[in-house]
Amino acid sequence: MAILKRGARNKTHQEPAKRGGNNIKKAAFETSKKKEVGVSDLTLLTSISDESINDNLKKRFLNGTIYTYIGHVLISVNPFRDLGIYTDAIMKSYQGKNRLEVPPHVYAISEAMYYNLKAYNENQCVIISGESGAGKTEAAKKIMEYIAATSSTHSESIGKIKDMVLATNPLLESFGCAKTLRNNNSSRHGKYLEIRFNSQFEPCAGNITNYLLEKQRVVGQITNERNFHIFYQFTKGASDNYRQTFGVQLPEQYVYTSASKCTSVDTIDDVKDFEATIKAMQVIGLAQEEQDQIFRMLAAILWIGNISFIENEEGNAQVRDTSVTDFVAYLLQVDSQSLIKALVERIVETNHGSRRGSVYHVPLNIVQATAVRDALAKAIYNNLFEWIVDRVNKSLHAYPGADKSIGILDIYGFEIFEHNSFEQICINYVNEKLQQIFIQLTLKSEQDTYAREKIQWTPIKYFDNKVVCDLIEAKRPPGIFAAMNDSVATAHADSSAADQAFAQRLSLFSSNPHFEQRQNKFVIKHYAGDVTYDVLGMTDKNKDQLQKDLVELVGTTTNAFLTTLFPNQVDKDNKRRPPTAGDKIIKSANELVETLSKAQPSYIRTIKPNQTKSPNDYDDHQVLHQVKYLGLQENVRIRRAGFAYRQGFEKFVERFYLLSPRCSYAGDYTWTGDILEAVRLILQDALIPEKEYQLGVTQVFIKTPETLFALENMRDKFWHNMAARIQRAWRRYLQRRIDAAVKIQRTIKERKEGNKFEKLRDYGTSLLGNKKERRSMSLLGYRAFMGDYLSCNESKSNGSYIKRQAGISEKVVFSFHGEALHSKFGRSAQRLKKTFILSPTTLYIIGQVRVQNAMQYTADYKINVNSILQLNMTNLQDDWVGIVLANSSMPDPLINLSFKTELITHLKTLNSKIQVKVGPTLEYQKKPGKMHSVKCQVSDTAPKYGDVYKSSTIFVRRGNPANSKSKKKPRKKSSGMSAPTTQSSKTLAPPRMSSNNQNTTVSQSLNGGMNVKPQTPASRSAKKPAPPPPGSKKPAPQPMAKKPAPHPTPQAQMQTQTQIPASQSSATQSSIPPPPPPPPSKTSEPQFEAAYDFPGSGNPSELPLMKGDIVYITKEEPSGWSLAKTLDGSKSGWVPTAYMVKHEGAKAPPPAPAVTASQPAIQNQSQPASAQTVAATSQVPASFGDGLVSALAARANKMRVESDEEAAASSDNDDDW
């Protein structure tokens, strides 16, 4: 995880002032987001129990929050109302997000499946489980809608497939769902929808697998339930053509739709749903003829239900109204008499070994005839439903290229009714298999994996329902379905006998703890609760056979569509028992398990909060029961103790090797070592703590989903970061080219036209007319009129802060700190610190005041440039300027500004009518209409770099002549940094002298001076000024040979080395051994002595010194200044480095080296130390003064950058430069 770094906080920082205006709205964060109620993930509960889980679900349900996580498992509570949480905006908010970034939602599960499909190229599936009415079908619909909306579409065919997939929902709901007591849209069949994707992860095909349609519902329902939706849609919404052609009536006219006394439901609009069904058929591609045949079969089923029977004279069944059978025969396109005969008679054929026996026509009673009638209706509807599913699959398979898939399992929920028969045991068996899958893939498989991979783990107990599945489906020993099949085989002709045989065989399971037998009933202890099943009629339903009479009847039809529904003709020679319904459901369930096992599963556990379908009721007892049988508590415990993600080493490396520079380069996998070591390197380079993962035998286990999401996030950003690096390098290259071109252009322009800032400087000098003395700094070649010294025009600077507080919105032409004279009645005038800012129209004099330890600035004067009449100055080198205003009600400002000449120049440029007056006195209006004169006198007691104002008199030192000209701009040195000066075994040569009396003591001074840092262009220019002339008799405290030349230039060294005689060079080498490598810094600070007087400029940060003062040097700067403190530590401040020499104390001077060559050397030896000092110091290069000027210029430049230090800056402006 990345470490977030915060910038240092300023203690004096305050919140910015609130700005007016109503255009900007107050920032808000997810105002539509509800306040979190309970916990969104049950693994975060403080106590783990069924009751605490139930309480959390209840809080969230009553708050309108129906989704909760257990790790990656989603818990959904049916709200029985529209919460408005399935809009397009909400759907988009989940796209591209992991489940921790957004609240729990079925869209989050959908996004995770689609992301994993693309990221890992593995099949995905979602298993939606729960009892009937818990919301499984709705969850499946929302998943399909999300995937269809999220997946990209680059062609018309892909878009058509997406539309087809969505159209399967209303179509299959109409034919496969019905209203029950618990659910108004209960799935009465199971389906597994696979959405298949191509290599671009676009939906290109689909497939639907159907499981066990509840065809018994076609012929009968319990009170207040309904038949399948399509019957009510068709009877209420059929067109006039269908009503005339197929004789369609209202649902109240048909026995199959009215017997349960519920033909309408408040929350269902059958006519509107019928329109949706017709539209879905059209989208899927059903032709109009196919639609007509489907509705023809539906009409036939409804009219078959209206066939009724009466007893004839022999007590056998007879059709009550033959007009009904005639119309049914018309719809089925069969002979009417053949239909009647098939309904009231049964053909029985006897066999005698291999010989064919006799054929008997056995009449049926009313009960038997009614059963035959219902069997025909059920067979037609069941085969019609399977045909529709096959037809949908045919349309969805039309586009090739399917590679991977996402499967959505929407199957009937667990059912417990008052009377439970064969349909309920099949439904509950399938739910037991799904529960077994959940256990195997989450609980058992997870713990088995930890044990196999040798991961540290504490086993958790759970209930494995495999024993219940074996009780129902096993063959050896036989289970309930096997016992049922044996009973049917034993007494296939008599259903009652078969039921009795089955009841007797149930005694075989009496020893099973999950089974109880009760007369003609038996109890199975399912994971969801105990269910009591009725034996009567169960074996007959298990046969799942249509009588041969009816099969032969259908075979005589002239309707090609009906023939398609019943393709298999009766094979009279086949003696093998056909598969029963139990065999089919076992086969389908095992195939489903195999299919789900091949995909990466996601889970949605749905919960029904009440039996009344009320949006406000929450039945604690009912929900607590579901929490228990769904095993949520065990799931929470395993999730808290386990690992959120596991993956094989190779798959993990393939996914995340980009995160390790040691395993990849430019997107290619480069690691050649062990795959396990690659996993370690990836986790180390991604900065994943060791406690967040464990390495097994073949897999890596990551504990928390946050860590996995962090890895995924880093991987997603890898290519973005690489592209950004390339872009930065390219932009840097382009910028260098631009900068180089601009530099060349600027240089050429300056060569041709001159520098505009220097031109402005020369113009300003001419304004003074050689009347005012010049300060030394104003004569520097580097001096140029840059204008905005406080950087007011920049966005982030102290100057821009001052500008904002003063309310200045114009572009700034000139800005600098200075002083203004403030007069008080009866008291001496005060010099107050001010900031001067000049815009194209106004001169601002800004005052400052400290409020709550923060500096605040306000504009004291706002002077229109056009209102200035005169700018008055004295003829000496002082910095005072009197600004004479026209028709002002306020006194004229008298200001003191180091950059006075530049300010005057800019004012003159903006207003050419301003008069510049220079004379022995300075005049300004101290009061409106009353001129006041200020004298200026030369005084040696005045500060060297300042002046003194007292009693309307300015005291200042003598400056440079008024006609002094600015020096030429010196040539810039190379921009490259010179290599640090390293001391070799040879002694450094002394600088070249103009006379012949040279001495090796000069070379000693080079090595005996201060230890300086590696020279930079700035440090080389900071040389000390020339010492007194040779004729001076000031005594030196020690031989000047000991004083170093602290910053010798490489050129000087080369020149002196070439001019030293060979004998003298050898003498130097013999007398002075090579210096050792630089020793480690000592704890005691070095002592230095002032070689010259340094009175200072009045800046409190400087330390004034007299020649000979000894101080400690604690810090040296490349700008030519050193931080010094007195020996007693009472004072400290900055001093010029060039003014200081190392103090040797009482150490004796080294002996003179032997001279072996020439007489001048002997004469040089005989000179006294003072003469040697003069000889050594008199040869300072002529450019020494220029070096000092450059050093001071560098210092002033530094002060300008650090302009926010007002106290230091205001008094550190040495001169007008």
From Swiss-Prot:
**Which superkingdom is the protein from?**
Eukaryota
List all Pro residues biased stretches: 1025-1038, 1072-1081
Q: Detail which positions bind ATP.
A: 130-137
Q: Which CDD domains match?
A: MYSc_Myo1, SH3_Myosin-I_fungi
User: What are the Low complexity biased-composition ranges?
Assistant: 994-1007, 1050-1071
Pfam families given for it? Myosin_head, Myosin_TH1, SH3_1
- What are the record's GO terms for cellular component? actin cortical patch; cell tip; myosin complex; plasma membrane
Query: Which protein, by its recorded name, is this?
Result: Myosin-5
Naturally occurring in which organism (per UniProt) = Candida glabrata (strain ATCC 2001 / BCRC 20586 / JCM 3761 / NBRC 0622 / NRRL Y-65 / CBS 138)
